[in-house]
Swiss-Prot record:
Protein's name according to its UniProt entry: Large ribosomal subunit protein P1
UniProt-listed Gene3D superfamilies: 1.10.10.1410
Organism: Rattus norvegicus (Rat)
Organism placement in taxonomy: Eukaryota, Metazoa, Chordata, Craniata, Vertebrata
Gene Ontology annotations of biological process type: auditory behavior; cellular response to cAMP; cellular response to Thyroid stimulating hormone; cochlea morphogenesis; craniofacial suture morphogenesis; cytoplasmic translation; genitalia morphogenesis; hard palate morphogenesis
Cellular component, GO, one term: cytosolic large ribosomal subunit
Cross-link Glycyl lysine isopeptide (Lys-Gly) (interchain with G-Cter in ubiquitin), sequence positions: 92-93
Protein function: Plays an important role in the elongation step of protein synthesis.
Top-level taxon: Eukaryota
Length: 114
């Protein structure tokens, strides 16, 4: 979980981005000081450097666009490639999802007191 210092810097950077102002250490410090939050001195510089060459708008839009989940187990040493082992696991997941969706379609929630 993020600390208060990290959250203050994050919110400051988002405010600056929303106002279409360049994110700098001084501007982050100014917002944090105006909010009355005590922050360790390295946080604003760290966030300013991290966000210097980043398109914050695209970063916000792509937050939930992660890759596929890793396979359930690791392949044993000298075993088949992970992609070959992951294919049956993916088929099982798809079948399980289909079964769950069929069950949810059948049960409309009318049996609350059964």
């Amino acid at each position: 979980m993020a600390s208060v210092s990290e959250l203050a810097c994050i919110y400051s950077a988002l405010i600056l981005h929303d106002d279409e102002v360049t994110v700098t250490e001084d501007k982050i410090n100014a917002l944090i000081k105006a909010a009355g939050v005590n922050v360790e001195p390295f946080w604003p510089g760290l966030f300013a450097k991290a966000l210097a060459n980043v398109n914050i708008g695209s970063l916000i839009c792509n937050v939930g666009a992660g890759g596929p989940a890793p396979a359930a187990g690791a392949a044993p040493a000298g075993g088949p490639a992970p992609s070959a082992a992951a294919a049956p696991a993916e088929e099982k997941k798809v079948e399980a999802k289909k079964e769950e969706s069929e069950e949810s379609e059948d049960d409309m929630g009318f049996g609350l007191f059964d």
